[in-house]
A protein has these predicted regions:
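Conserved donor NDP-sugar-binding/catalytic core segment of glycosyltransferases
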Residues: 140-186
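Short aromatic/hydrophobic "clamp" motif used to bind/position activated sugar donors
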Residues: 133
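A recurrent flexible, glycine/aromatic-enriched loop bordering the glycosyltransferase active site
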Residues: 118-119, 126, 174, 180-215
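Nucleotide-sugar-dependent glycosyltransferase catalytic core
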Residues: 1-12, 174-180, 184
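A short, glycine-/small-residue-rich helix N-cap motif at loop->alpha-helix starts
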Residues: 112-119, 125-128, 142-143
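N-proximal low-complexity "stem/linker" segments adjacent to membrane-targeting elements
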Residues: 15-70
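Acidic donor-binding segment of Leloir-type glycosyltransferases
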Residues: 69-113
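Active-site acidic Asp-centered loop
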Residues: 84, 136-139
């Protein structure tokens, strides 16, 4: 039908643009009319360091690591756990267990008192061996197996400095889809609390886009 032909032409125009500009990527339709997904073809598979701050809450950390091990199909990665003054024995027992079974995991110790998320992550980054760093909370669980390839495709572009991913609460509502300066005051998260299926303004929530910040 006519709309199908229009979508095919729109999709092909993006492909042609990539060819003219020397960008190695494929383009595919999404379930949303007028929104297309570009997949950048990785010429190399660089080491990605996944920095995870942790203080006790070992059950959350286990779920996080297990989801990475079971669902993430990007193999060239390492885990840098930043231990932040935990007190429970089972936390340190898990660290020992993780290091024994996973050669790509390491635990470093942050000994300052008090909580400063930025300083703890920056400290962990000093021990990262990877060319790219993924900062991840210990209560995060991975949903898509190709999320690292997807993020790397954008990270490896010369005009991109930082990349974020959509995050969802357990009930399927949106936790994070970027930050917009001036929204609701100084800055805020657009679509926070909305169902993941929400269409939003012109379907923007379902498209890769530039934002003021990511977290």
């Amino acid at each position: 039908n006519e709309s199908q032909n229009v979508e095919n032409e729109e999709c092909q125009s993006i492909v042609n643009h990539y060819r003219r500009t020397g960008i190695h990527a494929t383009v595919e339709k999404t379930e949303y009319s007028g929104i297309y997904r570009s997949r950048y073809i990785l010429k190399e598979l660089p080491l990605v360091s996944i920095v995870i701050p942790n203080k006790d809450h070992v059950d959350d950390l286990k779920k996080c690591i297990n989801s990475l091990e079971e669902k993430c199909n990007y193999e060239n990665k390492e885990y840098v756990i930043v231990e932040n003054n935990s007190t429970e024995n089972k936390t340190f027992e898990y660290y020992d267990e993780l290091i024994k079974k996973c050669s790509c995991a390491s635990v470093i110790y942050w000994k300052e008192k008090g909580f400063n998320y930025s300083k703890i992550n920056n400290y962990g980054a000093r021990f990262a061996k990877g060319e790219y760093i993924l900062f991840l909370n210990n209560d995060t669980e991975i949903q898509n197996s190709d999320f690292l390839q997807e993020m790397l495709g954008y990270c490896m572009r010369k005009d991109v400095g930082a990349v974020g991913a959509q995050m969802f609460y357990e009930d399927g509502t949106i936790q994070h889809a970027g930050v917009i300066v001036g929204l609701g005051g100084l800055a805020s998260h657009p679509y926070a609390g909305a169902p993941k299926e929400t269409y939003g303004h012109m379907g923007r929530i379902h498209a890769v886009q530039e934002l003021s910040a990511v977290t």
